[in-house]
A protein has these predicted regions:
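A ligand-binding cleft/hinge motif common to bilobed small-molecule-binding domains
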Residues: 93-94, 108-120, 169-172, 193, ...
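Extracytoplasmic small-molecule ligand-binding "clamshell" domains
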Residues: 28-111, 119
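Acidic, polar ligand-binding/catalytic clefts
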Residues: 75, 79, 84-152, 224-230
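Ligand-binding clefts/hinges and TM-proximal coupling segments of bilobed small-molecule sensing domains
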Residues: 16-20, 165-180, 218-221, 251-278
Length: 278
């Protein structure tokens, strides 16, 4: 009889112990915000090989890290959500498909909210410091290095990234020759630095960083109302169309971050980029 009583007591104690311990694991896990980044469009995003106080590890590429203005804005969103930020490096043409497949929650990759892309995803308000402006970067040895207007590029050879406005905008320069499109922005940069093409169309901020880090490149900016017609709001974050809660949270953070604060983020980002290039 004593044996049965002892077993009963042990069973009750085990149940109590299990109940008490089960309560220890009831704290909700920290949410994760998964973003996709191309890592090839400085100063918005680029890849590094060493960790720093500013970059984030790429979850799908061991020993690699991502930094850039896009990443710093995404950090603000993740902090506001109380979430861990997970960054995946994804090729440009696979960013929207990856979003639709559910592999990532948002795109923070210098992406413009073009009409075609708006059919595939919902986009936040622009988070740039200033409105998007396209410029031209030319090789200083090109006969077009002193061009000042879009019409001055007749006969010039240009290339751009496949499936982007950087390539289709070449058609706005009368007489310019659109060479075959390339797969990424790095190949655009290689083409103009090597002299394979005379120039490339590029976002103004990126063009400035190229000019600052390459002695044989020159940025050409056009007067207001005399440059490219771009037809979109600007650089935005992309989410799935039904993810209104995340979209609203991103927009709230963008609205709350003043232009002055965003300028400071961009200035610090460009400073790191130039330091890395020196």
């Amino acid at each position: 009889m004593k044996k049965y009583i002892l077993l009963l007591v042990l069973a009750v104690c085990a149940c109590v112990f299990a109940y008490v311990n089960s309560g220890k694991d009831e704290t909700p896990a920290k949410p994760v915000l998964r973003i996709g980044v191309e890592c090839d469009y400085a100063p918005n995003n680029w890849e590094e090989k060493r960790p720093s106080a500013f970059n984030l590890p790429l979850s799908n590429q061991e020993g690699a890290y991502a930094d850039g203005y896009d990443l710093q804005i995404a950090k603000l969103v993740a902090d506001d959500m109380g979430a861990t930020l997970e960054v995946r490096k994804i090729a440009w043409n696979d960013l929207l498909p990856a979003l639709q497949r559910g592999e990532i929650d948002a795109i923070f990759s210098g992406m413009l909210d073009t009409e075609e892309r708006r059919r595939q995803a919902a986009f936040s308000d622009p988070y740039e410091v200033t409105a998007t402006e396209y410029s031209v970067v030319v090789n200083t040895s090109s006969p077009y290095a002193n061009a000042k207007k879009l019409t001055d590029f007749s006969g010039a050879k240009f290339t751009g990234q496949k499936g982007t406005k950087l390539y289709s905008s070449i058609g706005q320069m009368p007489g310019a020759i659109a060479m075959p499109a390339v797969d990424n922005v790095s190949e655009m940069l290689d083409a103009v630095t090597s002299g394979k093409v005379d120039g490339i169309v590029i976002n103004l901020d990126t063009g400035r960083s190229y000019e600052a880090t390459h002695s044989n490149l020159k940025l050409i900016r056009f007067p207001e109302n005399e440059g490219f017609v771009i037809g979109f709001s600007g650089i935005c974050a992309g989410v799935r169309k039904n993810d209104t809660e995340l979209l609203n949270r991103i927009n709230m953070v963008i609205e709350r971050t003043t232009k002055n604060e965003r300028q400071k983020i961009m200035d610090a980002t460009v400073s790191r980029l130039l330091k890395n290039a020196s």
